[in-house]
């Protein structure tokens, strides 16, 4: 009874603690003992070190690092990092300073190294909340553990990786959670009896939405605040809003054909977009930074907000007109707008066309991007391994299923099954995130939240469809009065319901593989912990399964080199571990540090 009341909180709490431990425990000592210097070190290349430079300036000058004279020397250039992430690390150092020896710069090292791991572990919570809200408590627990040990996420949120990735994904996940809640609860009932082409009619609809659906509109505002937080930490924030707009466009097209009112979802998305637009505007509008019309700054958001308002105005103003006429008119307006951008591009008056067609130049193909490793398409093995092969396939399958369900309303006979707008948002999110990850390695990390969400939904769906309820009934009917009876009942029920043991074996494979890859992602390459964990996993398998019987064994019986300092042992993997050594952060060598 007690476990039945508290199992979910215990499961989520243990996932949170495990996520933090995996990201921290093997990285603290190497981070504090840099090779060649014995001082602090960081992983992730040069980006974290520039972040450290910005934080040092904040601590020394008590102001944001705007102009860096060492960039584009001797002219100087702007600090390309938005302020919120670097300031959160700097203020973390200030908060820790009274409790640690040394000055604030020494205390800041703990904040710089530790906060990314904190942000990474906290991402478990919005993922669990999303899974629980839309797929049930079981999915929430599974989603939390999938995210806690997701290889692609662990490898970008470890201790001493002082980059904005973990911060961005935490608040991006929060933004999508609130937006999914908003579109799921706001519905498509008519807010206004009439439709009108006057743009002020949209304002009237937004007022009606606040009056009739205050909770949904509050969630839309919270989504906007979350996305704005991302904007103040990373200039590539627009990709999340582009996914939201793509789902909105598809939803309004469905509403047109089915004669439903799009005013509720239009009101919610306009409020959300404007919140995201207004909050970071003072930073991007700083005249020294000149980021308002920068292709990697605020310019893409102008297009997203503009298309959202125009799209919403068309589908609400002409709600009661024939849908074919509205689609033709909307296509005409879009053609004029896009054609204008293209002409301005040809006349070299604007680069808006390139910004739209290359995703703010993130998908551009030129010689410069050819020199950037993370801008290249990953190998298929790397892509599958970053999410877990089975998790990736399950998530894609669930995405296609959700796309189909997105065209339907919630079934009154099965209200727990997610359908409608929220299902459509999840489907568009997983499909676009998969395409982005397929196109460039830098986007694999961004796809991890939705992989965990849809992967957990797929696991729960498979388990329910395996016939587990009938299995339990058969098991009880066969008798469960003693350990022997329970064992024989399990065997008998498994024979009658073969789907349960089959799906059970698949899930064992999924979770064991996911856990091994996740732990491997948290261990720095070349560290002794890599070999120690590898030997521990090797020792979990009974020797009888590796025994060679008539030239055949259940598992690989090849000789294994144990951990140790002797001639026949190894202290690190050196590419010869059985389970570890595929992932993991890398600290700098003595040559770099000195």
State the predicted function of each range.
Residues 17-20, 102, 115-133, 138-211, ...:
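Membrane-embedded helix bundles of polyisoprenyl
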Residues 332-335, 462-522:
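Signature aromatic-anchored transmembrane alpha helix within multi-pass, membrane-resident enzymes
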Residues 1-36, 46, 141, 217, ...:
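Start-transfer (signal-anchor) and selected internal transmembrane alpha helices
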Residues 218-227, 242, 248-249, 258-284, ...:
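Hydrophobic alpha-helical membrane-interfacial segments at the cytosolic entry of transmembrane helices
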Residues 204-214, 257-264, 320-330, 393-427:
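Membrane-interface helix-loop-helix junctions at transmembrane boundaries of multi-pass membrane enzymes
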Residues 125-129, 174-182, 244-255, 273, ...:
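Transmembrane alpha-helices and membrane-interface helical segments
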Residues 296-316, 328-408, 422-423:
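Alpha-helical transmembrane segments at the extracellular/periplasmic loop-to-helix junctions
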Residues 24-134, 138-146, 150-171, 191, ...:
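Active-site lumenal/periplasmic loops and adjacent helix-entry segments of GT-C-fold
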